[in-house]
Amino acid sequence: MSAETVTGHNEKAYALLKSDAEKIRKLIEVQLENLTMPQCPLYEEVLDTQMFGLSREIDFAIRLELIDEEQGKQLLSELERKLADLHEATVRK
């Protein structure tokens, strides 16, 4: 494979992971904006499942050397901070 093709695959993989992370971030934002039912078990289950799925996607991309481990950690870290904000907001409510 040419260097251009490899770079293209790497960029596409990272863009797809960022897109999936953005969808989860939006779920978190919606819950933060609508804290009508703090600690909704169903919502928490959905977020946990989405986060687990994304972590598996990231792990797979790292193992295929499509993204750097640091890039993957950064994506998860940003979402984990958002989740911490959500949990903090539900405790205050």
Curated annotation (Swiss-Prot):
Organism from which the protein derives: Halalkalibacterium halodurans (strain ATCC BAA-125 / DSM 18197 / FERM 7344 / JCM 9153 / C-125)
Family named by the database record: Belongs to the UPF0358 family.
Domain of life: Bacteria
Protein name: UPF0358 protein BH2626
InterPro entries reported for this sequence: UPF0358, UPF0358_sf
Lineage: Bacteria, Bacillati, Bacillota, Bacilli, Bacillales
